[in-house]
């Protein structure tokens, strides 16, 4: 039976100094050595609306840990707001922050010999960073996020009422047909509350995936940040981690450990969910990284196979259903992630050999929490009725509105059954060809089916900034393929998100008339024919470095291919002309020492853009 890790610092005469410091930090002497130490990894910051409300959350979780018999020790990680960092040099730091967050959690837990971990995350790189840390540490862990923002609603000057999200504010800003007065109303109402942005963007996608992989409680990905139900979720997460801690240290039950929950089968189920809900392409990057931390063999090949068999069952903003736009509050009303998992399970698309921090089996999980099947508990039914308050608020659990009815319409509602899927093909796809030998990814749920096959001339850009300039000065025309290179993990460095180029294409009316291909990545808010993660990246000698203006590129989503229509002899000539120097031309960019350190070990996106520590020797 394993001993508490904390015994290292709580037992023995030689640890009198450590115990003295614990007493000084507020731990009752009688608890030292008797109760498990629970690390509470918070990510509160005033920079990010998805995290501004997390200071009191840390206290709620800590108090619940104490009440459940543990010693809570809260600390904070950094948290970058991708929306604010977008479109300038700040975005270079976003993806590298994932590794810093993972390392900081590891450092704090290992330095202080914590017995278990609660991760209070929310936005884009924070959940993936903490997930990597949890799988690396492999101690009892529960994730609980800050929750999604409510969708926005604006009354325009002409009286029209629009539902909104952050991406609307970005794309409409370059639409010359919209007045300054309406732009201001959109800006003021696009993000009305605290929480992670209201669509199925990266933050919400990842918080939903922690549910599917089994490391968080039902509702983690969909209960609104403003709702009182979220407070109950925090308290339950604290009680759950104490239960897992006792099962591991007192009953020798290692099934509760993250690596025994996040198994290959669990990764497969999480990816099936991701494809079905049309999640952010960033999730592919983060799941690849997490699989490596879990020492699970799971890569693009497995993801590609699933993308051919799992249909699209939900279209949530920025993806648009034919009749309306859905947001996370609508996913919640339809039964949340358990409802999606239930539909996949009834379609025979999930592996049943999994368990979670809250249920011993998938069958038990769905029986209790899926309102569309089985016999859901009263607690589950109550949870899914939690509704938006429709009042501007930066405070957590500030409202307790409830839906009168749930959306259980599997034929025409937010979440569809396999028989009534939005499309037979899932919401994400992996493409391969001579332009991306090791693969690239596209969110098919956000692509109009009329352009699932596309061919056009390349407009080559050596940076995101050059692409933006060309789009805004009408150098990109209908039918073009915008190629943005040297924006990969190594070449950027940092693998920037290309939300501004895609938003500007949309704002200029080219969202269904152009394609964009890059070795960088996309925001979860991206829609359109936006193909990212081209691997190998340009800086690593990928074919994307050889593209020239006017080259024709053919994209075929149904057949999962992407081809640069230039013969091999010409590509060889171009490669020889580069003489082994793969670097952007005429790009003026300041790269700090911190970013250079990241670039020195960064792998391409098909490996999750993780650090290759073997390069350290």
Swiss-Prot record:
<keyword id="KW-0100">Branched-chain amino acid biosynthesis</keyword>
<feature type="binding site">
    <location>
        <position position="124"/>
    </location>
    <ligand>
        <name>Mg(2+)</name>
    </ligand>
</feature>
<keyword id="KW-0028">Amino-acid biosynthesis</keyword>
<feature type="binding site">
    <location>
        <position position="82"/>
    </location>
    <ligand>
        <name>Mg(2+)</name>
    </ligand>
</feature>
<dbReference type="InterPro" id="IPR037237">
    <property type="entry name" value="IlvD/EDD_N"/>
</dbReference>
<dbReference type="GO" id="GO:0051537">
    <property type="term" value="F:2 iron, 2 sulfur cluster binding"/>
</dbReference>
<dbReference type="InterPro" id="IPR004404">
    <property type="entry name" value="DihydroxyA_deHydtase"/>
</dbReference>
<comment type="similarity">
    <text>Belongs to the IlvD/Edd family.</text>
</comment>
<feature type="binding site" description="via carbamate group">
    <location>
        <position position="125"/>
    </location>
    <ligand>
        <name>Mg(2+)</name>
    </ligand>
</feature>
<feature type="binding site">
    <location>
        <position position="197"/>
    </location>
    <ligand>
        <name>[2Fe-2S] cluster</name>
    </ligand>
</feature>
<keyword id="KW-0411">Iron-sulfur</keyword>
<feature type="binding site">
    <location>
        <position position="497"/>
    </location>
    <ligand>
        <name>Mg(2+)</name>
    </ligand>
</feature>
<dbReference type="GO" id="GO:0016836">
    <property type="term" value="F:hydro-lyase activity"/>
</dbReference>
<keyword id="KW-0479">Metal-binding</keyword>
<feature type="binding site">
    <location>
        <position position="123"/>
    </location>
    <ligand>
        <name>[2Fe-2S] cluster</name>
    </ligand>
</feature>
<dbReference type="GO" id="GO:0004160">
    <property type="term" value="F:dihydroxy-acid dehydratase activity"/>
</dbReference>
<dbReference type="GO" id="GO:0000287">
    <property type="term" value="F:magnesium ion binding"/>
</dbReference>
<dbReference type="InterPro" id="IPR000581">
    <property type="entry name" value="ILV_EDD_N"/>
</dbReference>
<dbReference type="InterPro" id="IPR056740">
    <property type="entry name" value="ILV_EDD_C"/>
</dbReference>
<feature type="modified residue" description="N6-carboxylysine">
    <location>
        <position position="125"/>
    </location>
</feature>
<dbReference type="GO" id="GO:0005829">
    <property type="term" value="C:cytosol"/>
</dbReference>
<dbReference type="GO" id="GO:0009097">
    <property type="term" value="P:isoleucine biosynthetic process"/>
</dbReference>
<dbReference type="Pfam" id="PF00920">
    <property type="entry name" value="ILVD_EDD_N"/>
</dbReference>
<keyword id="KW-0408">Iron</keyword>
<keyword id="KW-0460">Magnesium</keyword>
<dbReference type="GO" id="GO:0009099">
    <property type="term" value="P:L-valine biosynthetic process"/>
</dbReference>
<protein>
    <recommendedName>
        <fullName>Dihydroxy-acid dehydratase</fullName>
        <ecNumber>4.2.1.9</ecNumber>
    </recommendedName>
</protein>
<keyword id="KW-0456">Lyase</keyword>
<keyword id="KW-0001">2Fe-2S</keyword>
<comment type="pathway">
    <text>Amino-acid biosynthesis; L-isoleucine biosynthesis; L-isoleucine from 2-oxobutanoate: step 3/4.</text>
</comment>
<dbReference type="InterPro" id="IPR020558">
    <property type="entry name" value="DiOHA_6PGluconate_deHydtase_CS"/>
</dbReference>
<comment type="subunit">
    <text>Homodimer.</text>
</comment>
<dbReference type="InterPro" id="IPR042096">
    <property type="entry name" value="Dihydro-acid_dehy_C"/>
</dbReference>
<dbReference type="Pfam" id="PF24877">
    <property type="entry name" value="ILV_EDD_C"/>
</dbReference>
<comment type="function">
    <text>Functions in the biosynthesis of branched-chain amino acids. Catalyzes the dehydration of (2R,3R)-2,3-dihydroxy-3-methylpentanoate (2,3-dihydroxy-3-methylvalerate) into 2-oxo-3-methylpentanoate (2-oxo-3-methylvalerate) and of (2R)-2,3-dihydroxy-3-methylbutanoate (2,3-dihydroxyisovalerate) into 2-oxo-3-methylbutanoate (2-oxoisovalerate), the penultimate precursor to L-isoleucine and L-valine, respectively.</text>
</comment>
<comment type="pathway">
    <text>Amino-acid biosynthesis; L-valine biosynthesis; L-valine from pyruvate: step 3/4.</text>
</comment>
<feature type="active site" description="Proton acceptor">
    <location>
        <position position="523"/>
    </location>
</feature>
């Amino acid at each position: 039976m394993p001993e508490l890790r904390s015994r290292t610092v709580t037992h023995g005469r030689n640890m009198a100094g450590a115990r003295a410091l614990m007493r000084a930090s507020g731990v009752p002497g009688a608890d030292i050595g008797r109760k498990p130490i629970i690390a509470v990894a918070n990510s509160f910051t005033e920079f990010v609306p998805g995290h501004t409300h997390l200071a009191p959350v840390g206290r709620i979780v800590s108090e619940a840990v104490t009440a459940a018999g543990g010693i809570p020790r809260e600390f904070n990680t950094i948290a970058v707001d991708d929306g604010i960092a977008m479109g300038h040099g700040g975005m270079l730091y976003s993806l590298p922050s994932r590794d810093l967050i993972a390392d900081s959690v590891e450092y704090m837990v290992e330095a202080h010999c914590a017995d278990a971990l609660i991760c209070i995350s929310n936005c884009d790189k924070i959940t993936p960073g903490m997930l990597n840390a949890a799988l690396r540490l492999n101690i009892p862990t529960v994730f609980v996020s800050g929750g999604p923002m409510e969708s926005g609603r604006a009354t325009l000057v002409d009286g029209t009422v629009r539902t909104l999200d952050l991406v609307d504010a970005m794309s409409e800003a370059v639409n010359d047909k919209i007045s300054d007065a309406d732009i201001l109303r959109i800006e003021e109402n696009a993000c009305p509350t605290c929480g992670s942005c209201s669509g199925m963007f990266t933050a919400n996608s990842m918080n939903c995936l922690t549910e599917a992989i089994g490391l968080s409680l039902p509702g983690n990905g969909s209960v609104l940040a403003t709702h009182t139900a979220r407070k109950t979720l925090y308290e339950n997460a604290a009680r759950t981690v104490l239960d897992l801690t006792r099962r591991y240290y007192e009953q020798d039950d290692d099934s509760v450990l993250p690596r025994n929950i996040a198994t290959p089968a669990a990764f497969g189920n999480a990816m099936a969910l991701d494809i079905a809900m049309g999640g952010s392409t960033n999730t592919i990057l983060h799941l690849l990284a997490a699989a490596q931390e879990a020492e699970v063999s799971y890569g693009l090949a497995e993801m590609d196979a699933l993308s051919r068999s799992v249909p699209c069952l939900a279209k949530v903003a920025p993806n648009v259903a034919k009749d309306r736009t859905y947001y996370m509050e609508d996913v919640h009303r339809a039964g949340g992630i358990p409802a999606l998992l239930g539909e996949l399970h009834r379609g025979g698309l999930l592996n049943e050999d999994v368990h979670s921090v809250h249920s011993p089996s998938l069958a038990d999980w769905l029986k209790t929490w899926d309102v569309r099947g089985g016999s859901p508990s009263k607690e589950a039914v109550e949870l899914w009725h939690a509704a938006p308050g429709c009042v501007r608020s930066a405070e957590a659990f500030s409202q307790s509105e409830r839906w009168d009815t749930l959306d259980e319409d599997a034929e025409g509602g937010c979440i569809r059954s396999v028989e009534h899927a939005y499309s037979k093909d899932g919401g994400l796809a992996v493409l391969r060809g001579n332009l991306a030998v090791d693969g690239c990814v596209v969110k098919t749920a956000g692509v109009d089916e009329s352009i699932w096959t596309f061919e056009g001339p390349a407009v080559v850009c050596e940076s995101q900034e050059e692409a933006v300039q060309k789009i805004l000065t009408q150098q990109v025309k209908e039918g073009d393929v915008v190629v943005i290179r040297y924006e990969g993990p190594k070449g950027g460095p940092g693998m920037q998100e290309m939300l501004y180029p895609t938003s500007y294409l949309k704002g200029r009316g080219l969202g269904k008339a152009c394609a964009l291909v890059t070795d960088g990545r996309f925001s979860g808010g991206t829609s359109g024919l936006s193909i990212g993660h081209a691997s190998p990246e340009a800086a690593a000698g990928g074919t994307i470095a050889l593209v020239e203006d006017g080259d024709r590129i053919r994209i075929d989503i149904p057949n999962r291919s992407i081809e640069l229509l230039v013969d091999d002899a010409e590509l060889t000539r171009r490669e020889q002309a580069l003489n082994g120097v793969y670097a952007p031309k005429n790009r003026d960019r300041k790269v700090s020492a911190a970013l250079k350190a990241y670039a020195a070990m960064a792998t391409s996106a098909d490996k999750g853009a993780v650090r290759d520590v073997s390069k350290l020797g």
